[in-house]
Swiss-Prot record:
Protein name: Bifunctional protein GlmU
Subunit comment: Homotrimer.
Residue numbers binding UDP-N-acetyl-alpha-D-glucosamine: 9-12, 23, 73, 78-79, 140, 155, 170, 228, 333, 351, 366, 377
Record key words, sorted: Acyltransferase, Cell shape, Cell wall biogenesis/degradation, Cytoplasm, Magnesium, Metal-binding, Multifunctional enzyme, Nucleotidyltransferase, Peptidoglycan synthesis, Repeat, Transferase
Chain residue ranges for the region called Pyrophosphorylase: 1-230
Pathway: Nucleotide-sugar biosynthesis; UDP-N-acetyl-alpha-D-glucosamine biosynthesis; N-acetyl-alpha-D-glucosamine 1-phosphate from alpha-D-glucosamine 6-phosphate (route II): step 2/2; Nucleotide-sugar biosynthesis; UDP-N-acetyl-alpha-D-glucosamine biosynthesis; UDP-N-acetyl-alpha-D-glucosamine from N-acetyl-alpha-D-glucosamine 1-phosphate: step 1/1; Bacterial outer membrane biogenesis; LPS lipid A biosynthesis
Amino acid sequence: MSNRFAVILAAGKGTRMKSKLYKVLHPVCGKPMVQHVVNEVSQLGLQKLVTVVGHGAEKVQEQLGNVSEFALQAEQLGTAHAVDQAASVLANEEGTTLVICGDTPLITAETMEALLQQHEEAGAMATVLTAYIEEPAGYGRIVRNENGHVEKIVEHKDANEKELAIKEINTGTYCFDNKALFASLSKVSNDNVQGEYYLPDVIEILKNEGHIVSAYQTEHFDETLGVNDRVALSQAEIIMKNRINRKNMVNGVTIIDPSNTYISTDAVIGSDTVLHPGTVIEGNTVIGSDCEIGPHTVIRDSEIGDRTVIRQSTVHDSKLGTVVSVGPFAHIRPDSVIGDEVRVGNFVEIKKTVFGNRSKASHLSYIGDAQVGEDVNLGCGSITVNYDGKNKFKTVIGNGVFIGCNSNLVAPVTVEDGAYVAAGSTITENVPSKALSVARARQVNKEDYVDQLLNKKKS
């Protein structure tokens, strides 16, 4: 196997997207298009990877980091001109160079590997990735000679009747002998309507010089989809979503309604977990085995333990233990750590809190900036009052504490192990271990008060 290099074309603005966000940074299943391409290309054993950037160069470089070198195409003068910007990095190298667009998020490493192998086995100077489609209108046609090699690529508008009948099309992905590529780029002309330098012209140059130009026809046309507008973006999203869902189902995850379930490419889900309709799993989420998620649940960048149930709730940037029950309509906000066998019930919000094993907040509570021990019961309407309008303060609740309904714990405050707080209390001072704290006005009954009040209103 020869040395391998790759050039990703990511300089276009994407005018048809009608967006402030640069085209290749538009996400597909939660990840920018160009990141999908880089992740797949990086599996090919490359010696060097160069991403050609232009519009939004800094943002693209920030997204990709140090996994790629970068070349700047300050003025967009066509695809051949874009590749030529990588000359300072690659022109003197010997080997094979893959050229692919950064707006093809569905391409897989397997397809690109097959393309490279075809190129190397054929001893070609260039190899074109092609596909067969029944309705090829608008695509360049691949004309092969008697040896099966590429004779020429004919654009749809330039094709004759015989060529229009060809259903093998150019996908816009190529590999080249690296030295031949950069030698040919200087020969490409911009004598065309757009005044641009086009990469397919390199194919014609090499062919006219007597070199072999081969083609590899992929069976997976959907992988070659180029995203140029929001319609194509939605198509890519659907295809990627279906691919991810299928992979998870093959690995033992039950997805009740795949058309209404969204899973990020980086999520990991254990076997025998069930996902109900309306479930959205984003980012680097890890979900254990035998869980039940949804319906209508969002989990982002979180770790969920085995045998946990989350219904109609939201979990962000948090860690949940095993056998946890969440929801319905609960919200676990970032930096929360929920222990094992915990109950977080309906309309409970937890933020930046450590919540101990076997503890419960079953209804209508806000627990923020708190440390909750084990075997704690927080009654309906329990609130940690953590904010004074300027600063956040911490509430500490020990093991075995029982907080009565409709209680306010005004932070900073500590309720020590085994203490009880009476319903309706507003706690502003620490509660000692095993004490009962009552902080509410004493009840007063005024006999016959209602009759007196009504008579007063009548007079």
